[in-house]
Amino acid sequence: MKKPIVAVIAGGYSGEHSVSLKSAAGILSWLGSEPFSTFLVLIERDRWSVRVSEQREVPLDKNDFSFDLDGERIRFDYAYITIHGTPGENGLLQGYLDMIGIPYNTGDTLVESLTFNKYVCNRFLSGFGIRIADSMRLTGRDTQPDVADLIARMGLPLFVKPNVGGSSIATTKVVEAAQLLPAIEQAFSEGEEVMIERLICGTEVTCGAFLRKKEVVALPVTEVVAHNEFFDFDAKYNGAVEEITPARISDEATRLIQTMTARIYELLNARGIIRVDYIIEADGIPTLLEVNTTPGMTPTSFIPQQVRAAGMDMKEVLCTIIRDGLNETQ
């Protein structure tokens, strides 16, 4: 029987391009050559290509998601999206794949566009009783807000960050009024909307989840102890953080985080692997920070740590997701 041909899609148009390539390398190493034939698909603004060997790339035909290899026309059976940012995390790529009938590992266009907008996603989930931080959104019309009015409403300290995007790029902790406008300008440099969020104090944790045989599996919880003021890009990717899996929290708190994560997965009708970040405040109740539907997948990322702590391996988890996706289309 012919092996299914799987595209591991990486790259994208955002500042997280390099992170995406590292995640793709991790996924390809775990999948290996069995039970699927896997290829790296690189998406750039001016070119979509397939890496068929270390030294060779060939163009990808966007009409049917296929490519020519030595005279043979090869069409992908499945797409594993590991783009962090646009177009893989905001629903654009999902819409394209839906139109040409290629199954994939994430939520659909609606789910991805919702979760990519931090402010809107958190507001949506708060309607189901999920606690969120006090926040506000600025659009392109609000590039010079009244600082005094904003601080009177939100207080200090607070966080300023792009409303879409990830990896804590252009995120600033603001502790005094003079820092606010520069922080807003920096966040606007990465996108058209800015989210301002009240500082939450407590223990930062994160929990992954995936679907196995139509049941949501919540993974062990990781505690995040940043050596910087907060878990910024440097902490995430340059080692300025301590990541403890399982987290040093009570069994009751662990169960609560896992239950909330599974519920968020179901409320969003998510697919594949997601990761949800929280702060456990002094009252023991978790406050939602954000939902990530294409989490980092390098060997040292949170999800692989949690999978190992659960006694599973990444190949097993990835193959489960891909097989389930292929079976749904048969």
From Swiss-Prot:
Instruction: Tell me how the cofactor is bound.
Output: Binds 2 magnesium or manganese ions per subunit.
Binding, ATP? 151-206
The task this protein performs is described as:
Cell wall formation.
Reactions the enzyme catalyzes: 2 D-alanine + ATP = D-alanyl-D-alanine + ADP + phosphate + H(+)
Enumerate the UniProt keywords alphabetically: ATP-binding, Cell shape, Cell wall biogenesis/degradation, Cytoplasm, Ligase, Magnesium, Manganese, Metal-binding, Nucleotide-binding, Peptidoglycan synthesis
PANTHER family in the cross-refs: D-ALANINE--D-ALANINE LIGASE (PTHR23132), D-ALANINE--D-ALANINE LIGASE B (PTHR23132:SF23)
Q: Name one GO biological process term.
A: peptidoglycan biosynthetic process
Q: What is its EC number?
A: 6.3.2.4
InterPro entries per the record?
ATP-grasp, ATP_grasp_subdomain_1, D-Ala_lig_Van_CS, D_ala_D_ala, Dala_Dala_lig_C, Dala_Dala_lig_N, PreATP-grasp_dom_sf
The record's similarity note reads: Belongs to the D-alanine--D-alanine ligase family.
Q: Name one Pfam family in it.
A: Dala_Dala_lig_N
Coiled-coil ranges from the UniProt annotation: none
Q: Which organism is it from?
A: Porphyromonas gingivalis (strain ATCC BAA-308 / W83)
Q: What is the lineage of its organism?
A: Bacteria, Pseudomonadati, Bacteroidota, Bacteroidia, Bacteroidales
UniProt cross-references to SUPFAM superfamilies, sorted A to Z: Glutathione synthetase ATP-binding domain-like, PreATP-grasp domain
**Origin: domain of life:** Bacteria
Q: What is this protein called?
A: D-alanine--D-alanine ligase
Give the GO molecular function terms.
ATP binding; D-alanine-D-alanine ligase activity; metal ion binding
